[in-house]
């Protein structure tokens, strides 16, 4: 199991200046190399200030598009970066799935296999800053680099009663996918052992340790 210790930093000024000082964690596990060998460059940096978790995803990949036009859409079909987290380190988890234009899918997945989608107030509380802007666009061929910053308040874990990230230990995984891109791919930070692409595997999350 991989582990990341997340530093506590009180942000002031531009977030990018803080992210520039932090290590890049690679989303590089190609878990299904026979069927889906393509491995774009993807990674993330992160810190927290107690009340919010700050994540910057950084991607370089071929052939991108932005078809999803609203939150809670089919985010995984566009260039998509994902953060799945279990606040209690068990089989209950949330999935934050964000496209290259900042469209977000967020839901709560308790261990009984039901799903509860986040409401508009919770979605709006997760601030997103995509480098490509927020408007949809058609297929852009060739290599492209993009990033998105997500600011996730503890209250976005809306069924867990988390008030602060201070001193917490959680389990999580980070992903890069694009199911309907010219070259579909399914990458993870922590390895996944499963017969087919599936990111909904909380038993195979890594560990996050919050300062």
Please identify what each model-predicted range represents.
Residues 1-211:
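Structural preference for beta-rich elements and adjacent junctions enriched in aromatics
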């Amino acid at each position: 199991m991989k582990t990341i210790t997340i530093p506590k930093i009180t942000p002031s000024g531009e977030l990018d200046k803080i992210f520039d000082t932090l290590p890049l964690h690679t989303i590089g596990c190609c878990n299904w190399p026979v069927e889906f060998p393509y491995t774009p460059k993807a990674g993330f940096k992160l810190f927290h200030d107690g009340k919010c978790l700050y994540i910057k995803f950084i991607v370089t990949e071929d052939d991108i598009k932005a078809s999803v036009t609203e939150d809670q859409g089919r985010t995984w079909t566009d260039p998509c970066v994902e953060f799945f987290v279990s606040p209690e380190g068990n089989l209950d988890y949330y999935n934050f799935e964000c496209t290259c234009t900042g469209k977000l899918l967020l839901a709560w997945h308790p261990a009984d296999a039901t799903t509860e989608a986040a409401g508009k107030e919770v979605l709006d509380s997760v601030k997103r800053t995509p480098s490509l802007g927020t408007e949809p666009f058609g297929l852009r061929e060739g290599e492209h680099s993009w990033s998105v910053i997500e600011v996730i308040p503890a209250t976005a874990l809306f069924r867990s009663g988390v008030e602060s990230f201070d001193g917490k230990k959680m389990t999580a995984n980070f992903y890069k996918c694009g199911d309907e891109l010219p070259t579909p791919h399914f990458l993870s930070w922590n390895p996944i052992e499963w017969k087919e692409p599936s990111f909904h595997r909380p038993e195979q999350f890594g560990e996050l340790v919050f300062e």
